[in-house]
């Protein structure tokens, strides 16, 4: 994938607009997870070291084009300064004369954060005038928000049409990891795709089948495939209306030479609550009044054996209802084994999606995978094979501006 990075960029004295993703989880005004801030810090530090005047901007939450004080980026700018170890200014606007004055007063190496771009309706509408108003405060645009790349908004796509545009280091790392996962992977390559519904991951499964050698279907989604094969899944969550689709997917996988691996046993319970009585049974022997809530030990063993044969693993979705013990066991055991193989240099592991990242953190191995994407929606749309506007414009804008 051809896009320009910060390598060799002369940023000294230049106003560099950095589109970060500062949309961090907050509770009662306190940031509960600063991962996204930690991830964007290397790009900002590099630009500061190069003598740039760094102007950071981002969306936060969904204010729907209105000014909502509780959704201000002010507390996030403060936290970013603590992470970077230097003062970070804050401007209570993202366009207009106040911003122009603040940017005009910056010295080389200074950093400011602008107010939430979504306080303006022009952001989500990708209004060209709003994009121009953002762009006029920069000489260079650096997009370091892969997690917002699936949205064609003014701050992700519009600005890139008006300024020389580059991928930041986090964007570069995400794109390199994703390319290694599915575009040019070391084979054999496998994917763990979990979640509750086939209907929400149809495009994803269809795209992945074309690219992987082994597809592990896990979580409640597997129940639909099992039921479509005539297995009794008791009272388990499943989509009866998707049985024919599941059979078509299985047939397509066979045509493409992709092996689908389904659970062979399960941990079941009568209630979906913490620490309720459970039993383990083979698939096909699930009691009528029970629900499948986790993969069983034989399934874990089967997946571990298959992981031994792979060079690359893409992971999206847990193996069971991992949020509640003891239904986290299969997810934790497979995650820890994948991490062990990664540490031994035998497997490249690329994981993403909100539940997946939470599950890997729960298993204590989020930092031991080759790459864990914080992107959520953008990661899923990339897995679906969709064009991401924020990436596409980085490729085309350089050409438009004669900067290839």
UniProtKB/Swiss-Prot annotation:
GO molecular function ontology, one term from the record: ATP binding
Pathway: Carbohydrate degradation; glycolysis; pyruvate from D-glyceraldehyde 3-phosphate: step 2/5
Cytoplasm keyword on record: yes
Predominant location category: cytoplasm
Catalytic reaction(s) noted: (2R)-3-phosphoglycerate + ATP = (2R)-3-phospho-glyceroyl phosphate + ADP
Keywords: ATP-binding, Cytoplasm, Glycolysis, Kinase, Nucleotide-binding, Transferase
GO biological process, one term: gluconeogenesis
Major enzyme class: transferase
Binding site for substrate: 21-23, 36, 59-62, 118, 151
E.C. designation(s): 2.7.2.3
Binding site for ATP: 201, 323, 353-356
Transferase in keyword set: yes
PROSITE patterns: PGLYCERATE_KINASE (PS00111)
Family per record: Belongs to the phosphoglycerate kinase family.
Protein name per the record: Phosphoglycerate kinase
Organism: Gluconobacter oxydans (strain 621H)
The encoding gene: pgk
């Amino acid at each position: 994938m051809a896009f320009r990075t910060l390598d060799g960029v002369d940023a000294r004295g230049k106003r560099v607009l950095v589109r970060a993703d500062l949309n961090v989880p907050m509770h009662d005004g306190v940031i509960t997870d600063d991962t996204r801030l930690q991830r964007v810090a290397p790009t900002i530090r590099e630009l500061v070291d190069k003598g740039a005047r760094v102007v950071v901007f981002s969306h936060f939450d969904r204010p729907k084009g209105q000014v909502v004080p509780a959704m201000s980026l002010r507390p996030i700018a403060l936290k970013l300064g603590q992470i970077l170890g230097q003062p970070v200014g804050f401007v209570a606007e993202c366009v207009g004369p106040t911003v122009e004055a603040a940017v005009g007063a910056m010295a080389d190496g200074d950093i400011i954060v602008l107010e939430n771009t979504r306080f303006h309706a022009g952001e989500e509408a990708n209004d060209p005038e709003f994009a121009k108003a953002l762009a006029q405060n920069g000489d260079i645009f650096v997009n370091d928000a892969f997690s917002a790349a699936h949205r064609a908004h003014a701050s992700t796509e519009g600005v890139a049409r008006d300024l020389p545009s580059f991928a930041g280091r986090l964007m570069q790392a995400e794109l390199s990891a994703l390319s290694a996962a599915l575009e040019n992977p070391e084979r054999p390559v496998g994917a763990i795709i979990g979640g509750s519904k086939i209907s929400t991951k149809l495009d994803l499964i269809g795209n992945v089948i074309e690219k992987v050698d082994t597809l592990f279907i896990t979580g409640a989604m597997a129940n639909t495939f099992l039921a479509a094969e005539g297995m009794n899944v008791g009272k388990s969550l499943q989509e009866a209306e998707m049985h024919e689709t599941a059979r078509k997917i299985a047939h397509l996988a066979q045509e493409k030479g992709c092996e689908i691996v389904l659970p062979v046993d399960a941990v079941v319970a009568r209630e979906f609550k913490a620490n309720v009585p459970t039993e383990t049974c083979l698939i096909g022997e699930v009691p009528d009044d029970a629900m499948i809530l986790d993969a069983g030990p034989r399934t874990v063993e089967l997946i571990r054996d298959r992981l031994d044969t792979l060079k690359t693993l893409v992971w999206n979705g847990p193996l069971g209802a991992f949020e509640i013990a003891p239904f986290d066991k299969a997810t934790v055991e497979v995650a820890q084994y994948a991490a062990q193989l990664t540490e031994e240099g035998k497997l490249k592991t690329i994981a993403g999606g909100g539940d997946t990242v939470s599950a890997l953190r729960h298993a204590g191995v989020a930092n031991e995978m080759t790459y864990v994407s914080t992107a959520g929606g953008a990661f899923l749309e990339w897995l679906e094979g969709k064009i991401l506007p924020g990436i596409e414009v980085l490729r085309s804008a350089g050409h438009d501006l004669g900067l290839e």
